[in-house]
Amino acid sequence: MRKLMIGLVALGLAGCAMNYSDIRKNSTQTFTTTKSLEQMETCLIPKLDSETYNGPAINTTVKPLENGVTLVPLAGLEFIDLIKSNAGTEVVYYGEGTKSILFPERRIKVTLKAIKSCL
């Protein structure tokens, strides 16, 4: 039983091995919208913060970029760049850091749903 628990913990933590640079190598998905950066930020943050994933409430942080902001909702394991463009806002989602052996796409699907609902 003890070996089984150790194995499950190791599998669960396997997705946590990515660092900031690894996560940012490839975006998960990119969107464009005619909404302003401020509208997207105001819409997305409450949606991201409403998810708990059976743990403590998420507290999305906002970090400045040269032409926008980065939203960091889950302990730095995923990022959403909101970049000002002439047509509105480009939304770039980096979600690979949230993948795990047990739930490979769960967090990504929830975040993409939140993004799409704000577009």
Describe the role of every protein-language-model region.
Residues 12-15:
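C-terminal motif of bacterial Sec signal peptides marking the signal peptidase cleavage site
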Residues 1-4:
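Positively charged n-region of N-terminal signal peptides that target proteins for export
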Residues 17-119:
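Ser/Thr-rich, low-complexity intrinsically disordered terminal regions
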